[in-house]
């Protein structure tokens, strides 16, 4: 590995000892030699740190947060200590496929300086890939990114980003939507969509609709509603006008999510007011009627509706 490697793989982790070992193994078996791995432990309370230290490889750097700050803050910490020209984000429960960094290196050598992000594909546990539908070969500016994101069923992709861009656009601290970063990035920089599958998403969480999991979900939704509302409001403030023109479906979803967050946060009067205004504009939005109906009954019924919807989608 050179003093300034080509890639820094940044892996945020919280209470995932088994999964982080799998993610690290997927990095260390890469044939491309010019990379480092920065693991950011977001104040885990189990053996996650010990799991990382069981890999005494000089390419791995372990950083630790004193307090749990969320995945975006952990990624920012990793980027701040990265030396690579390109940043590769990898979730702790996912893994790079064999040869992934070789593919990234080849693609990085082919792109002009005007391209600041390479978007690679994920392999999903349920089959198929994302993003879907395929947009391989397209170079997306701000408006192109909005139109693309508005039309896809699966929008997640593996990010390979020039480190220099983080001086202009950083991930939002706290627990607001990561989507803010992608929109802010798209307004400043261009993304090349690529056909190569470089990583696998693993679904390690059991999707069992137990009473305990439902109650945890409800508590989490209510506790995080104010922060989620902040994220939605930030997106609408920064990008609402462009979204309404280039991504009307996404814009409509954000308006409904704002209503949902208001109701879950206990701001019932404002939530119902915005809800009726939303339905006046979109009377055929069945999910809008469902949100308003459940929210009128209280925070718990609305959170339960979200729980059932999440299990149905899974």
Residue spans of the language-model regions?
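Conserved nucleotide-sugar donor-binding catalytic segment
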Residues: 132-216
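C-terminal subregions of glycosyltransferases and related glycan-biosynthesis enzymes
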Residues: 196-314
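A conserved acidic beta->alpha catalytic loop
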Residues: 26, 41-50, 67, 91
């Amino acid at each position: 590995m050179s003093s300034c490697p080509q890639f820094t793989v940044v892996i945020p982790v919280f209470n995932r000892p088994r999964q982080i070992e799998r993610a690290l193994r997927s990095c260390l078996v890469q044939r491309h030699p010019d990379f480092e791995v920065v693991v950011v432990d977001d104040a885990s309370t189990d053996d996650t740190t010990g799991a990382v230290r069981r890999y005494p490889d000089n390419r791995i750097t372990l950083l630790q947060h004193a307090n749990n700050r969320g995945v975006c803050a952990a990624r920012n910490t990793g980027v701040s200590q990265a030396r690579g020209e390109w940043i590769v984000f990898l979730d702790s429960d996912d893994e790079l496929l064999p040869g992934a960094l070789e593919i990234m290196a080849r693609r990085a050598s082919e792109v002009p300086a005007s391209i600041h992000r390479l978007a690679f594909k994920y392999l999903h546990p349920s089959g198929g890939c994302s993003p879907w539908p395929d947009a391989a070969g397209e170079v997306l500016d701000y408006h192109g990114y909005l139109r693309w994101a508005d039309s896809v069923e699966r929008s997640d992709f593996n990010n390979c980003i020039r480190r220099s861009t983080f001086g202009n656009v950083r991930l939002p601290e706290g627990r607001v939507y990561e989507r803010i970063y992608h929109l802010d990035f798209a307004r400043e920089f261009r993304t090349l969509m690529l056909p190569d599958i470089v990583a696998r998403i693993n679904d390690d969480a059991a999707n069992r609709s137990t009473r305990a999991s439902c109650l945890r979900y409800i508590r989490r939704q209510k506790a995080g509603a104010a922060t989620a509302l902040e994220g939605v409001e930030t997106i609408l403030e920064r990008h609402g006008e462009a979204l309404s023109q280039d991504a009307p479906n996404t814009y409509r979803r954000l308006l409904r999510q704002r209503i949902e967050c208001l109701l879950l946060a206990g701001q019932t009067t404002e939530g119902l007011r915005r809800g009726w205004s939303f339905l006046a504009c979109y009377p055929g939005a069945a999910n809008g009627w469902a949100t308003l109906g459940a929210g009128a009954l209280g925070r718990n019924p609305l959170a339960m509706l979200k729980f059932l919807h999440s299990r149905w989608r899974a």
